[in-house]
Curated annotation (Swiss-Prot):
The name this protein goes by in its record: 3-isopropylmalate dehydratase large subunit
Cofactor comment text: Binds 1 [4Fe-4S] cluster per subunit.
Keyword Transmembrane helix: no
Subunit structure: Heterodimer of LeuC and LeuD.
Record Pfam families: Aconitase (PF00330)
NCBIfam families found in the cross-reference section: leuC, PRK05478.1, PRK12466.1
Domain of life: Bacteria
């Protein structure tokens, strides 16, 4: 019993029973829902005349389809209004807490749930959204699920799951100035590949990980799925406990002391056995930018676009496709590439610290001519705290647009979209073809501070140049 990983401990704690065929019925401690993947699930419940098993363990918000420039109801998009109205109705019918438009707690689901203290160490967390792995930053086992599984959790508060292998990614050293959690996770995905984590849960550990804030840790775990891992997690520690203390849904009084005791016991044992282990040097990582059409196609700011001919054979064709789609030439530098749009936000990088780091670059500068730049806080709470610190004024004075919370241009299921062949510098998580709303639109993923630097110069820029001034 002294050689278990956190994944083993949390899995065993939530295991209901073994199922025929080798899968496990796993109890889900927190179920998060939003307007996109829940309607069909509720319809299925209604057809079978089933209710929601534990309404108090499901929490809802609206984020994907909400406009960020004008959130007055009814929305101008009738489909978006219908999706929101449907979620409101379903939550009311089944007694589910809904953080909707007009609520001071509405926001992107993977931003608002942690800041309310809903996500806690040792939980199993499920949501009909790919980036549910975000919540692993707290020492939870969190994973995205499909609509049919959303139905199953609503009906039974459990899922049939197959246990994953665990790979520990140990990051030595400390990130240098101008290098952020986003750079680290892009670096990891680059080296392990977008399919490298298939069949694995990733445990992120080591000095460089331990030095990250909770918001940085959420960025890391958020993109574990982009490396193929179903979930990613970080062992809870004093940083975790300090973040949670006093949060609305965090334990209070004696219950807090009991929780701390249990949470401390969850960390992977010193003699835990992992299915695979990787070690990286965090101090050698530089600001990182994607150049292609997968999050794994990233390079440091000082590198050139890879020549497909010199890549492994299994990577050559997608690299050729990426160069053609992105209109980039092999061996040309990524630094200096022109951009059209700059987007700071998303469940990856729409938190207060992300906006603070970006504002340091923006302050006293002006957005370059012809560049459209906007900031979308990840939640109403983030927006409120940012305004209290005057961040909105810094961005507005520089020529950025300041928007209302929502998923925005991360996936463009709302009015925020690229047009034509526009290319964006984006703090989001995916750079797939057409991801940001235009079938021909192009995306360069980078940290919020790097996006800010790109907005000021009108092209991809090493943010460290601003930090030296």
């Amino acid at each position: 019993m002294s050689s278990r990983t956190l994944y083993d401990k949390v899995w065993n704690f939530h295991q209901v029973k073994e199922l025929p065929g080798g899968s496990t019925q796993l109890f889900i401690g927190l179920h998060l829902i939003h307007e996109v993947t829940s309607p069909q699930a509720f319809s299925a419940l209604n057809e079978k005349k089933l209710g929601v098993k534990f309404p108090n363990l499901t929490v809802a918000t609206v984020d994907h389809i909400v406009p960020t420039s004008n959130q007055q109801r009814p929305f101008s998009d009738p489909l978006a209004e219908e999706m929101l109205s449907t979620l409101e109705k379903n939550c009311k019918t089944h007694g589910i807490k809904f953080h909707g438009i007009g609520s001071n707690s509405q926001g992107v689901v993977h931003v608002m749930a942690p800041e309310l203290g809903l996500t806690q160490p040792g939980m199993t967390v499920a949501c009909g959204d790919s980036h549910t792995s975000t919540h692993g930053a707290f020492g939870a086992i969190a994973f995205g699920i499909g609509t049919s599984q959303v139905r199953d959790v609503l009906a039974s508060q459990s899922l049939a799951m197959n246990k994953l292998k665990v790979r520990r990614i140990w990051v030595e050293g400390e990130l240098q100035k101008g290098v952020y959690a986003k750079d680290l996770i892009l670096h990891i995905i680059r080296h392990l590949g977008v399919k490298g984590g298939v069949g694995f849960a990733y445990e992120f550990a080591g000095p460089a990980i331990e030095k990250l804030s909770m918001e940085g840790r959420m960025t890391i775990c958020n993109m574990a799925i982009e490396g193929g891992a179903r979930c990613g997690y970080i062992n809870p520690d004093e940083t975790t406990f300090k973040y949670l203390k006093g949060k609305e849904h965090a334990p209070k009084g004696q219950e807090w002391d009991k929780a701390i005791s249990w949470w401390k016991s969850l960390a992977s044992d010193s003699k835990a056995t992992f299915d695979d282990e990787i070690q990286l040097d965090g101090s050698s990582i530089e600001p990182t930018v994607t150049w292609g059409i997968t999050p794994g196609q990233g390079i440091s700011i000082k590198e050139t676009i890879p020549n497909p001919e010199f890549l492994p054979k299994n990577e050559q064709q997608i690299a050729k496709d990426a160069c053609k789609y992105m209109n980039l030439k092999p061996d040309e530098p990524i630094e200096g590439q022109s951009i059209d749009v700059c987007f700071i936000g998303s469940c990856t990088n729409g938190r207060l610290s992300d906006l603070q780091e970006a504002s340091k670059i923006v302050k006293g500068n002006t957005v370059a001519d012809g560049i459209r730049a906007f900031v979308v806080p990840g939640s109403q709470k983030v927006a409120k705290e940012a305004k209290e610190k005057g961040l909105d004024k810094i961005f507005l004075k520089a020529g950025f647009e300041w928007r209302e919370p929502g998923c925005s241009m991360c996936l463009a299921m709302n009015p925020d979209k690229l047009e034509g062949r526009q290319i964006s510098a984006s703090s989001s998580n995916r750079n797939f073809k057409g991801r940001q709303g235009s079938a021909k639109g192009r995306t360069l993923l980078m940290s919020p501070a790097m996006v800010a630097a790109a907005a000021i110069n009108g092209r991809v820029t090493d943010v460290r140049k601003f930090l030296q001034e």
